[in-house]
C-alpha cells in the first residue's frame, strides 16, 4: 500500500458564486454541465494529461443541480474515497475557503493551480499536519495560507515556515533539522506514520555536511530520501517498503532529475543505488529487499 492521497475537491468546490464546502452525494453524480461533460470525455482518451484535466475540472463551476444543504458535490474523477476525520475536514475546509474566496488573492490562487500545481491530489499526511497547525490560532498558517498550500501541493519547495506541524530540533552551519511526530489521532488521515526528520539546507544547491551528520545521529541512521523538493527526509525502517513503492511511481525523467540533484549524494549510497535500480527497471520487490536488507541494524 502506497501513501494515501486526498483531493482539494474533497474539501471545497467551485460554483458560479464562489467556493463552497464539498459534500458527498453519489445520487447527484448524474448531473453535469456541458463543460464538465467535455472535460470528463477528454480525460478518458488515451494519452490524456489527466492531472491537467483534473485541475480544469476543479476550477470549473459545478452544476447547480449538485448543490446540497451542506455544499456541492464534486465530479467523481476529482474526489477520493479517503476517510477524513471531521476535525480535519472542518479545519482544512474553512482554511481553503478563506484562501480561495479572498477578494485580493483568490484569482491568483486559481491561476497558480492552473499553471504551477502538479495536480489537485496531495499527501493525506501533509494535509493532516497542516490541520495540526490550524488548531493553533497564533500559527502563521492563518496568514500565509497560499504559500503553505503551494508547498503542501508540491508547487514550490517547502521550508520550515511552510511545512506541516513540526519542531526544530537542531541547527548546524549548513542545515536546519525538524522532527515530525505522529499526527494526533483526531486529525490523522489513514494510519499514523512513525517519527521522521527533515533536513533543510541553509543555502540551496549547497551540500549539507554537518547537517547530514546530525540527521544520521538524531534518526539512528534511518534510510534517507530526497524527493526533489529541496530537503532530505528520513524514513523509519517499517515504512521503507511503502516509501520506495511511492517513489517508484515517479516517471523516469523525474527520477533522473532527483538522482542528479545536488542534495542526493547527501542522502547516501543506498538512496543513489535505489534510484539507479529503478532506472534500470529492476523489480520493485528486488529493490525493496536490497534496501531493507542493507538498512537493518
Curated annotation (Swiss-Prot):
Keyword ATP-binding belongs to the record: yes
Needed cofactors: Mg(2+)
Annotated catalytic residues: 231 (for ntpase and rtpase activities)
BP GO terms, sorted: viral genome replication
Enzyme class label: hydrolase
Renumbered residue ranges of the record's region RNA-binding: 212-247
One Gene Ontology molecular-function label: ATP binding
EC number, as in UniProt: 3.6.4.-
Keyword Metal-binding tagged: yes
Annotated localization: Host cytoplasm
Subunit structure: Homooctamer. Interacts with VP1; this interaction is weak. Interacts with NSP5; this interaction leads to up-regulation of NSP5 phosphorylation and formation of viral factories.
UniProt protein name: Non-structural protein 2
Amino acid at each position: 500500500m502506497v501513501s494515501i492521497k486526498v483531493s482539494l475537491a474533497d474539501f471545497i468546490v467551485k460554483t458560479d458564486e464562489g467556493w463552497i464546502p464539498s459534500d458527498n452525494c453519489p445520487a447527484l453524480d448524474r448531473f453535469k454541465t456541458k463543460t464538465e461533460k467535455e472535460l470528463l470525455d477528454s480525460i478518458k482518451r488515451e494519452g490524456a494529461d489527466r492531472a491537467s484535466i483534473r485541475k480544469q475540472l476543479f476550477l470549473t463551476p459545478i452544476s447547480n443541480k449538485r448543490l446540497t444543504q451542506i455544499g456541492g458535490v464534486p465530479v467523481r474523477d476529482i474526489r477520493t474515497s479517503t476517510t477524513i476525520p471531521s476535525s480535519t475536514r472542518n479545519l482544512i475546509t474553512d482554511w481553503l475557503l478563506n484562501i480561495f474566496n479572498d477578494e485580493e488573492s483568490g484569482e491568483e490562487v486559481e491561476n497558480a493551480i492552473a499553471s504551477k500545481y502538479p495536480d489537485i491530489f496531495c499527501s493525506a499526511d501533509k494535509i493532516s499536519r497542516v490541520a495540526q497547525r490550524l488548531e493553533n490560532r497564533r500559527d502563521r498558517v492563518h496568514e500565509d495560507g497560499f504559500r503553505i498550500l503551494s508547498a503542501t501541493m508540491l508547487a514550490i519547495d517547502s521550508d520550515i515556515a511552510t511545512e506541516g506541524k513540526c519542531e526544530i530540533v537542531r541547527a548546524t552551519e549548513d542545515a536546519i533539522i525538524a522532527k515530525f511526530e505522529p499526527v494526533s489521532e483526531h486529525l490523522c488521515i489513514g494510519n499514523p506514520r512513525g517519527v521522521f526528520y527533515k533536513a533543510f539546507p541553509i543555502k540551496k544547491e549547497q551540500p549539507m555536511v554537518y547537517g547530514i551528520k546530525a540527521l544520521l545521529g538524531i534518526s539512528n541512521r534511518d534510510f534517507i530520501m530526497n524527493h526533489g523538493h529541496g530537503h532530505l527526509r528520513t524514513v523509519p525502517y517499517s515504512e521503507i517498503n511503502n516509501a520506495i513503492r511511492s517513489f517508484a511511481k515517479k516517471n523516469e525523467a523525474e527520477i533522473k532529475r532527483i538522482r542528479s540533484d545536488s542534495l542526493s549524494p547527501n542522502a547516501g549510497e543506498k538512496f543513489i543505488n535505489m534510484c539507479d535500480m529503478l532506472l534500470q527497471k529492476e523489480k520493485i520487490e528486488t529493490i525493496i529487499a536490497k534496501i531493507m536488507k542493507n538498512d537493518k541494524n
